[in-house]
């Protein structure tokens, strides 16, 4: 090939500098700060792995978690009965400072054998332990839960509440050790879609929103040293949870998730 003329060489160098930089797929796929990114591709469960009580990590028993019509659906039609098989669908990456948006709805009837409290009950677990460290018969990961509840047609039943398997929080300036506390949301009956969000600032403040309205706020999510599973996760006497995995729940009532989006926030 002949050598480039000086004008051609300058043109080639200019074009090369103007070309967009091609990033490795792993870097290009990472959520960018201050931008909403979908964690669900609308086609399959790529990036997500189930852990169901009594089954090995990765065993999607009974096709519990499936994708149909661009929606993550939690179903129990292949179960004889629920039998305490609580499930969690884990996303592959850990997060620390972020805002998570989930659109969900409850449908159909509860699986036979499901506990009464789990009727129209699901949620998102965050600051989760590594699912690979969970016991085979462990019902819930050590985590904080944004608990989703559907109305029962009578009375008040708030959603995007807080529950704390193996953890505690600081609420109104005091260590809060009961398992759950309610938000101040409205009750959502029927099979309507509901938008729930959580804003997490590492081991600092956590806020819960429903349909854009702030319904709960607390701080300092931390391991409970009295919990057997949490105790194994404590290192150097540090209890505060700075980061963790995210998971979607299966608690015996059919539920659907059509949007799971995250916005990574600056620390």
Language-model segments: residues:
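Carbohydrate-interacting regions of secretory-pathway proteins
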Residues: 25-267
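N-terminal secretory signal peptides that target proteins for export/translocation
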Residues: 1-6
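Bacterial N-terminal signal peptides
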Residues: 9-20
């Amino acid at each position: 090939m002949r050598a480039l003329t000086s004008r051609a060489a300058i043109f080639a160098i200019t074009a090369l500098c103007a070309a967009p930089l091609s990033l490795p797929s792993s870097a290009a796929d990472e959520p960018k700060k201050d931008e909403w990114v979908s964690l669900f591709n609308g086609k399959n469960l790529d990036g997500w792995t189930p852990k169901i009580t009594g089954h090995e990590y990765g065993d999607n028993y009974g096709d519990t978690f499936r994708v149909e019509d661009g929606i993550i659906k939690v179903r129990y039609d292949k179960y004889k009965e629920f039998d305490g098989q609580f499930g969690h669908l884990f996303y592959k990456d850990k997060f620390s400072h972020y805002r998570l948006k989930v659109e969900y709805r409850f449908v159909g009837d509860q699986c036979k054998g499901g506990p009464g409290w789990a009727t129209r009950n699901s949620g998102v677990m965050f600051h989760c332990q590594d699912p690979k460290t969970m016991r085979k018969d462990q019902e819930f990961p050590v985590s904080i839960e944004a608990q989703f509840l559907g109305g029962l047609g009578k009375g008040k039943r708030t959603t995007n509440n807080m529950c704390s398997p193996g953890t505690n929080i600081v609420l109104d300036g005091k260590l809060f050790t009961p398992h759950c506390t309610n938000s101040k949301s409205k009750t959502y009956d029927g099979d309507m879609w509901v938008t729930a969000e959580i804003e997490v600032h590492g081991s600092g403040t956590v806020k819960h929103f429903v349909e854009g309205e702030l319904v709960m706020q607390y701080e300092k999510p931390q391991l409970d040293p009295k919990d057997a599973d949490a105790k194994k996760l404590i290192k150097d006497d540090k209890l505060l949870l700075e980061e963790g995995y995210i998971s979607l729940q299966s608690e015996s009532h059919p539920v659907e998730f059509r949007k799971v989006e995250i916005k990574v926030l600056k620390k």
